[in-house]
């Protein structure tokens, strides 16, 4: 769920997902449309696509099982749908960590018209 995703981002990227990624580029935050603005925004695009492929449970509300050890997150549990959500969140948190250097304040709260071009397929 979103709280677990926030905790993964804190663990992997060392920063708050709510503070840093809730309104970034065209894909980080609510909705998503247009072209990803940079590698960080692409993390959110891929995360949105990943959530879009999940069926049978709600990515934003369901609790999943995971453990974290050192700098790694391991998704667990017997429910395949919940494990998929966990893997979407884990991969995005790792992507944020790996692309910290691309984060650019100019993409915070971008005007909606910036994101009106046609979206690329997942």
UniProtKB/Swiss-Prot annotation:
Cysteines engaged in disulfide bonds, as pairs: 26-115, 28-44, 43-95, 49-122, 50-88, 57-81, 75-86
Cell compartment(s), UniProt: Secreted
E.C. number: 3.1.1.4
InterPro entries: PLipase_A2, PLipase_A2_Asp_AS, PLipase_A2_dom, PLipase_A2_dom_sf, PLipase_A2_His_AS
Gene Ontology MF terms: calcium ion binding; calcium-dependent phospholipase A2 activity; phospholipid binding; toxin activity
Tissues expressed in: Expressed by the venom gland.
Major place of residence: secreted
Cofactor: Ca(2+)
Catalytic activity from the UniProt record: a 1,2-diacyl-sn-glycero-3-phosphocholine + H2O = a 1-acyl-sn-glycero-3-phosphocholine + a fatty acid + H(+)
Pfam families: Phospholip_A2_1
UniProt binding sites for Ca(2+): 27, 29, 31, 48
Cofactor binding, per record: Binds 1 Ca(2+) ion.
Domain of life, per lineage: Eukaryota
GO cellular component: extracellular region
Keywords tagged on the record: Blood coagulation cascade inhibiting toxin, Disulfide bond, Hemostasis impairing toxin, Hydrolase, Lipid degradation, Lipid metabolism, Metal-binding, Platelet aggregation inhibiting toxin, Secreted, Toxin
Active-site feature positions: 47, 89
Biological process terms in GO annotation: arachidonate secretion; lipid catabolic process; phospholipid metabolic process
Family assignment from sequence similarity: Belongs to the phospholipase A2 family. Group II subfamily. D49 sub-subfamily.
Summary of subunit composition and partner proteins: Monomer.
General function of this protein: Snake venom phospholipase A2 (PLA2) that impairs hemostasis. It weakly inhibits ADP-induced platelet aggregation when tested on platelet rich plasma from human and rabbit blood (15-25% of inhibition at 5-10 ug of enzyme), and dose-dependently inhibits blood coagulation, possibly by inhibiting thrombin activation. Exhibits high hydrolytic activities toward L-dipalmitoyl phosphatidylcholine. PLA2 catalyzes the calcium-dependent hydrolysis of the 2-acyl groups in 3-sn-phosphoglycerides.
Protein name: Acidic phospholipase A2 Tpu-E6c
Organismal lineage: Eukaryota, Metazoa, Chordata, Craniata, Vertebrata
